[in-house]
Amino acid sequence: MHLTTLEVAHSRTAEEIGSLVSSMRPAIPALTSLTFTRRSRLVKPMISYDLSAVAVSFLPASGEEVLSPPAVPLSPEDATNGSAADGDEYTYHHLRRDVFNLASESVAIASRYVVPSAHITLGRYLDQKDHATPEFRARWIQAIDDINKWLEKEVWDVADGEFIGEWIVGQERGLDARCGKLWYGGGRTIMTGEGF
């Protein structure tokens, strides 16, 4: 599973993707380690769905209590926005903007995803049999509502819970630059950035 910060291109041949990777290669180390100095938090996980998939979606943090263990502090020369504990002025949307701007210096971005989003796809529907009737759809929606109520009560803003309801982007590892047929776990990693 993954959260896409930036899709550079889609529906291209292997040769076209190879050319994009070659053009971007000098910028990839900076792109993948951007989260080391530009830290943002995602909070309030919820299950969401549309006609093709179900996902866990997050919101950019905006002042909620930091629940994660302390991260490696930044040295003064590395500090861009500090740690998540210093505030949420720098959000995931700022990170997406900065990744876009840095990548755009090397290649033209031709992404399918134009709306800012922070979601991890959990699964895609193979068919609509499970949603074929109003009763099936009502049962599906009720199950998602029940999970979301549990998340809000047991995970959001719970400092000592079994699960932590936030994600500091880049904690443990930086961004993962990948190429190839990436849907459903395909493709390969070019480089993974430094975590904290």
What do these predicted ranges mean?
Residues M1-F196:
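Histidine-dependent nucleotide/RNA phosphoesterase domain, centered on the 2H-phosphoesterase fold
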